[in-house]
Amino acid sequence: MSSATVAASRRQSCYLCDLPRMPWAMIWDFTEPVCRGCVNYEGADRIEFVIETARHLKRAHGFQEGRSPGPSPSSSSSSSSSSSVKPQLSAKEMAQIGHTMGGPEGVTRTSQQPPPPQCLDRYSLERPPPPRLGSEYGLGRQVNGILLPNGFPKPEEPPELNRQSPNPRRTSTVPQSLGALMNGTPMGSARATIGLSGASLVAAAAATTSADLSGKRPGSVSSSEHDGKEKHRADSYSELGENHKSRAEEWISKPKTVRDTLMAMQHSHSPFDSKFKKDTGPGRVLSFEANNPVSKSGARGGRKRKTSPEPEGEGGSVKINGEGQPWLPATESLKISTMASPSFISPPSTVSPHSNRTTPPEAAQNGQSPMAALILVADNAGGNHASKDANQVHSTTRRNSSSPPSPSSMNQRRMAPRDVPSQLPSGGTSSHAGMEQGLPQSIPDSSIPNSIPLCCTLCHERLEDTHFVQCPSVPSHKFCFPCSRQSIKQQGSSGEVYCPSGEKCPLVGSNVPWAFMQGEIATILAGDVKVKKERDS
C-alpha cells in the first residue's frame, strides 16, 4: 500500500466543506465532525446553527448522511464537483432554510413545507438564485419594526441578516417609491408606480400609524411629523422675539452701565437658533425663577454639561450650594440680569472688568438672585489676602484692560482692592471678607500670557512674564529677583527662608508655612553673581 493510500485512508471528511482533512485538522467537539477552517470561518458560537442548517439541506436535497471516513482515489474525481459546489450551497440556501425550517436564532417560521428531494445533477456553478416573490414571506415583512408590503426582490445576503442585527445594507432594500409612500405620498400614485395590491398598501399605512401610536420610533420620520415640529419651533421663536422686544423696553429704565452690559451679553452669547436647532423639540428650553434657582422641570440632564472650566460670562455652568445649575439659553440669562441688581455685571468684551467696583454690594445680598451674589463674590475673591498691601500698590496697577476675564486677570484683580474700601459703605468690606474666606485659591498665573503687566509686590516694578518668584500660597505675592535675593539674605540662606513678603504663608490644605528649597535659593543667589559680572563688564 502506497503512502498516498495510507494518508487518504486516514483522512476524515468535514461535514460542512466536504473536503478530506487530516485528523489533527478536525474538531470533534460538536454534533458533527468539522474542520478547523469551517469553525474559524463561521465562528464557534454559530457553528452548531450552521451544522443544523446543513443537515436540513442534506436531508432536503438527498445527500447521504453517512459518509465514509475518506474517499477512495478512484472516487475522488467524481466527487470533486459536488464537493466544490457544497460550500456555495450552504452559504446561499441558509437564508431560505431559515425562513422555512426555523432555527435557534429567532427566525420566523411559516407554513411552507421544505421542497421535495431533488437530484444532485440539478446544481451547477451557474445556478440561478431561489425565487423571492413566493408566499414564503407571508403577507408582509418587517424592516426596523414596521410592517412593509411584499413583492420586492431581496438581494443575496449572509444568513445573519435573518437576525435582528444592525446592518447598513438593510436600509437599502426599500425602494425609493416605497420610501415616498412612507413619507406621505398619495396612495394612488404609489400604487401605480409599485404595482401592489390595495390591501398591502393599507397594511403598510396602518402599521406605520400603529408604530407611531405605540411610541416606537419608525425607521424614517414622516414629513407631517417633521412639519409639526418645525411649526412648533417657529412659534417658539416668535414668542422669544416678542420677549426680546419687551425686555428692550424694560432696559430703557436701567442705568447706562447696566444697559451696556445687557447688550454686550446679548451679543456675546451664541444665538438661540444655532444652540437649540439640533434639539428634539423646544421642550428642552429651561426657565429660570428668581425664588427657585434650580429648575424643577425635570430636564436637568437633558443637555450635556461642558467639563472644562470657563470664565464668567462665557456660558459655563455655575454651581450653587453644590448643585449644578441647568443650562440656560441666552434669552433666559438676560432675565437673570434684569432681575439682579446693577452690581451683578458679568464682564463682557466691551466693559472694563472693574466697572462693578463702584457700586455697593448690598443689593446682591438682598436675595434677589443667588447666582448674581455668587458671581459677584467670585469676582472679588482674594481681596482679603492683599488688603494689607493696598496702601503700597502703585497707581500703575490699575486695570483698564478691555480683554475678557481670564484666570490670570482674576488673579490680578486680587492683587489689591485699591481704593475700593474708600468708595464702599462701612459694612461693604467686612461682608466681602466674610464671604471670601471660604473660597479656594486659584492656581498661579505665571504661565498664562495676558496683556496686563505683572508688578512686584514689594517694589512695584514691572515683572517679566517668566522671570519672577511666585508664592504658591497667596496668588497676589509676586516678587522680582532682586527683592527675593534681598529677602533671602535678610532671612539667612542657611536656615528656613519663607515668603519674601515677610509672612509665613501656609501651604494650601495645611498649616505648614511655605519655604524656599535649597535649589531655588541657589538659583536666585546665583543670578545675583551673574548680574554683578555683567554690570562690572
Curated annotation (Swiss-Prot):
Record keywords: Metal-binding, Nucleus, Repressor, Transcription, Transcription regulation, Zinc, Zinc-finger
Protein family (similarity comment): Belongs to the IRF2BP family.
Species: Xenopus laevis
Principal location class: nucleus
UniProt function note: Acts as a transcriptional repressor.
Organism superkingdom: Eukaryota
InterPro entries: I2BP1/2_C3HC4-RING_sf, Interferon_reg_fac2-bd1_2_Znf
Biased composition (Polar residues): 162-176, 334-366, 389-400, 423-432
A GO BP entry: regulation of transcription by RNA polymerase II
Lineage: Eukaryota, Metazoa, Chordata, Craniata, Vertebrata
One MF term in the entry's GO annotations: zinc ion binding
Subcellular location(s) of the protein: Nucleus
GO cellular component: nucleus
ZnF bounds (RING-type): 456-503
Region (Disordered): 60-179, 209-254, 268-366, 382-446
Protein name: Interferon regulatory factor 2-binding protein 2
Compositional bias per record (Low complexity), positions renumbered to this chain: 73-84
Bias (Basic and acidic residues): 224-254, 270-281
Flavoprotein is among the record's keywords: no
Record-linked SUPFAM superfamilies: RING/U-box (SSF57850)
Gene name linked to the record: irf2bp2
PANTHER family according to UniProt: INTERFERON REGULATORY FACTOR 2-BINDING PROTEIN 2, MYELIN TRANSCRIPTION FACTOR 1-RELATED
Region of interest (Cys-rich), residue spans: 456-503
